[in-house]
Regions:
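Short helix-boundary/capping micro-motifs
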Residues: 1-17
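Beta-alpha-beta core module
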Residues: 142-148, 152, 226-275, 283
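Secondary-structure junction motif
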Residues: 179-184, 188-212, 278-282, 286, ...
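Central regulatory/effector-binding core of bacterial HTH transcription factors
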Residues: 79-142
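A short LG(V/I)-centered, amphipathic sequence patch enriched
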Residues: 29-46
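Alpha-helical linker/hinge and terminal dimerization helices associated
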Residues: 31-32, 53-75
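Flexible hinge/capping segments at coil-to-helix
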Residues: 144-193, 197
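Hydrophobic hinge/microswitch elements
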Residues: 117-118, 129, 198, 203-257
């Protein structure tokens, strides 16, 4: 129910009848002694108690899987499984290189890589469904250990045609033209391509627009690939990790736009729960720190 969103969807996922799901849910509520769901329109919604219960269940299931893998690794250290999650850009551009080197050193180790936005990656790590995560700066209150960091930049990009218009707008302002001339008025007239809610890049974009004091129209696009393609064909401009568009910038399919306040300097963090690392995860951390991409974390800011 917590993941599927309805009795019907849960029944379809479990390949059982809706009556069986409803009966199991009723039995669970009797067992814990409180309602875990409440009516919501034509469906059901978790109560606050249900949300808390579901969070613990996620964590327990993750720990059970972690225990199974730890036992398997102890029995056969070379055949353990590495479980890692990464925000989309890091999963596409950074983690594959790390996993390639790790697999060369440990060819019999299994690998599970989960990709998602910042909120999804945090949930996977907190619920012990993965052992490591690559994400942006941990939010205050997130009890997590930083094992390594890697610098990266967020830049504004668009099609070469839009970038040329941006330079023309900046040049007109420099020449003393008034009215709608200038970079900021031009930027405010462009559609901005945003990732989905829960994305760290979206939050950075919203903060940048607030700093620039502009309120342009926006389009929500759900993946880096779709963002790149949309920007390349001129649908709008976007703030994106330079890692995600390195090939397009090199080929000229996209162009960087010199927006005031950019590039934004950020870091990728290799994170883990504050528990002893399973052997495969510890081996990846050692491999990462031996690479040129990541460094040991500095003192807290």
């Amino acid at each position: 129910m917590a993941e599927a969103g309805s009795v019907r969807a849960a029944a379809e996922q479990l390949v059982v009848t809706q009556a069986a799901v409803s009966a199991s849910l009723a039995a669970l509520q009797r067992s814990v002694g409180m309602p875990l769901v409440r009516p919501d329109g034509r469906g059901l919604r978790l109560t606050s108690a249900g949300e808390q219960y579901a969070a613990y269940v996620h964590r327990i299931l993750g720990l059970l899987d972690e225990a199974r893998l730890a036992a398997a690794a102890a029995a056969d250290p070379e055949r353990g499984e590495l479980r890692i999650a990464a925000v989309t850009t890091a999963a596409e551009q950074i983690v594959p290189r790390l996993l390639s080197g790790f697999r060369r050193a440990h060819p019999h180790s299994g690998v599970l890589l989960e990709a998602g936005n910042r909120d999804r990656v945090r949930a996977l790590l907190e619920h012990h469904q993965v052992d490591l995560a690559v994400a942006g700066r941990p939010e205050p209150g997130w009890d997590v250990q930083v094992h390594a960091v890697r610098a990266h930049q967020l830049v504004v990009v668009g099609s070469p045609e839009l970038a040329a218009r941006a330079r023309a707008a900046a040049g007109a302002a420099a020449a003393g033209e008034t009215g709608d001339a200038g970079m900021l008025p031009w930027l405010s007239r462009q559609p901005w391509l945003l990732r989905e809610p829960g994305s760290g890049t979206r939050l950075s974009t919203e903060a940048l627009l607030a700093d620039l004091d502009i309120t342009p129209s926006t389009l929500t696009v759900g993946s880096n690939g779709a963002i790149r393609e949309s920007a390349a064909v001129g649908l709008g401009v976007t703030l994106v990790s330079r890692d995600a568009v390195a090939q397009e910038l090199a080929s000229g399919r996209l162009a960087e736009i010199a927006v005031p306040g950019t590039p934004l300097h950020r870091d990728w963090y290799l994170l883990a729960n504050p528990d002893p690392l399973p052997l495969p995860a510890a081996r990846l951390v050692a491999h990462v720190l031996g690479s040129s991409d990541f460094q040991l974390p500095g003192p807290p800011a």
